[in-house]
Amino acid sequence: MPKPTKGPRLGGSSSHQKALLANLATSLFEHGRIKTTEPKARALRPYAEKLITHAKKGALHNRREVLKKIRDKDVVHVLFEEIGPFFADRNGGYTRIIKVEPRKGDNAPMAVIELVREKTVTSEADRARRVKASKKAPEAAAAAPQAAVEPEAVEAAPAPDAPEAAPEAEAAAPQPADEAEGSSED
């Protein structure tokens, strides 16, 4: 259910605020970033993010809901064909507000609001996880034949152990001789 926004309206009346937000959103989707006053940017952020969420869904009903607010069909086309699919794997946080220096004429606080074009940390972590898994897949495939060979190696292992025991016994036998040589030298 639509509820009126609290506080003073941007531009004076509610109809002017609706038109103002629609025009700001149109400019944002057309250019990717806009410079405006900080209160306008803060009011635009949830408005634009809801429109992007509609664009992610992509249904005809969602397109008509967006067309109620944004009258430029070219911008709506860009929103649904480029911006919406770009944010398909992102849950919110489509815009960023960066404070900039105040406006020179009236010292109004200014901000830049822009669409976030970088990949998310989680998507990069997912990519790293997939790369790691793909590297493990060949290792696992190589380990599977080795696992099949290991039982044969275990059966063949007692035969080599017997010759290895002989050199150990030979190494153990000269030690008393070495001790005997050492004691005779004293």
Swiss-Prot record:
Composition bias (Low complexity) maps to 139-177
Return one Gene Ontology term, BP aspect. translation
- Say yes or no: keyword Transit peptide present: no
**Which Gene3D superfamilies does the protein's record reference?**
Ribosomal protein L17
Per the UniProt entry, the signal peptide is none
Q: Where is this region: Disordered?
A: 123-186
- PROSITE patterns given for it? RIBOSOMAL_L17
Provide the alphabetized UniProt keywords: Ribonucleoprotein, Ribosomal protein
Q: Name one Pfam family in it.
A: Ribosomal_L17
Q: What's this protein's name?
A: Large ribosomal subunit protein bL17
Q: Which gene encodes it?
A: rplQ
